[in-house]
């Protein structure tokens, strides 16, 4: 819900999209810094998009989840454990949430990403990468002094992963309180997509308080356990076999057991 002042500023922007913050300040009789705060609030609440004062009329999706810097190493020949292996190292943008947001943007959808960025060069590159592909990150969190989420993995010469380290502690900062601060922009979305890199209490807060349809990627069989208490609040789940087995309690070995697992999941209140 907009405050009276925010509604007033919103109406002026609607009447004159090219209005400047200085003009708004003069018309409202407040400082320019105060106008900046109101504009930020309007953006966070989904009333306007970014700094260009584009009014939010087109339906949008919000994705809440991981945005990582992926670092991959692949040897030129057979991997030798405990030794330095000549090969290639590549860096790319990843994270389940970011990847979903990227694909939505490729489909020409209006998409916003709520994630946690650190305060390092990887965060700068990730943010630029999101903006370059059309992902709005105004709702995201920047954690002072923190390291941006990073996923490091080593493959063998065939491209099969052998070892990996994930540094994802930063998502502990995506707390229920942070979500509550951004609840307006989440509620106005056509749908909310989450992944289970979020803390369990945050997932449960979203499930209990967000009224738009919630879509979820369980990420892994271990992280999928965070969903057990809120499956009935989720609209659509995208599990693989291991995740479906863990959540349904049914071992999937053939078509019949697959259908039984699906029915068990749907019985929780899950729509799809």
Locations of regions flagged by a protein language model:
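Conserved phosphate/ATP/ADP-binding segment of small-molecule kinases
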Residues: 211-214, 218-272
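Structural motif
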Residues: 60-61, 190-191, 236
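Conserved N-terminal subdomain of the carbohydrate kinase-like
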Residues: 57-58, 76-88, 106-190
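Glycine- and other small-residue-rich loops at beta-strand/loop junctions that grip anionic moieties
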Residues: 28, 115, 194-196, 216
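Short beta->alpha connector loops
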Residues: 119-120, 196-200, 218-222
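Glycine-rich phosphate/adenosyl-contacting loop at the front of the ribokinase-like
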Residues: 4-5, 14, 19-23, 27, ...
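Short gly/ser/thr-rich secondary-structure transition/capping motifs
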Residues: 44-46, 172-177, 216-222
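Glycosyltransferases and closely related glycan-assembly transferases
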Residues: 202-214
């Amino acid at each position: 819900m907009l405050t009276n002042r925010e509604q007033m500023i919103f109406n002026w922007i609607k009447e004159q999209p090219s209005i400047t913050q200085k003009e708004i300040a003069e018309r409202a009789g407040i400082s320019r810094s105060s106008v900046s705060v109101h504009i930020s609030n309007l953006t966070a609440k989904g009333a306007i998009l970014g700094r260009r004062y584009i009014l939010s009329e087109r339906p949008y999706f919000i994705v809440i989840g991981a945005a990582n810097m992926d670092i991959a190493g692949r040897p030129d020949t057979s991997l030798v454990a405990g030794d330095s292996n000549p090969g290639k190292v590549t860096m790319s943008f990843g994270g389940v949430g970011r990847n979903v947001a990227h694909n939505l943007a490729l489909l020409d959808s209006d998409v916003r990403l709520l994630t946690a960025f650190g305060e390092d060069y990887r965060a700068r590159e990730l943010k630029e990468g999101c903006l370059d592909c059309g992902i709005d990150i105004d709702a995201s969190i920047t954690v002072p002094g923190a390291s941006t989420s990073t996923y490091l993995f080593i493959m063998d010469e065939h491209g099969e992963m052998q070892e990996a380290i994930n540094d994802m502690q930063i998502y502990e900062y995506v707390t229920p309180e942070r979500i509550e601060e951004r609840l307006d922009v989440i509620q106005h979305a056509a749908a909310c997509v989450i992944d289970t890199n979020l803390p369990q209490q945050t997932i449960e807060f979203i499930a209990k308080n967000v009224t738009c349809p919630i879509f979820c990627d369980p990420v892994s069989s271990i992280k999928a356990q965070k969903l057990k208490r809120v499956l009935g609040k989720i609209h659509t789940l995208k599990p693989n076999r291991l995740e479906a087995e863990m959540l349904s309690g049914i071992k999937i070995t053939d078509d019949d057991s697959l259908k039984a697992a699906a029915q068990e999941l749907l019985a929780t209140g899950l729509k799809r």
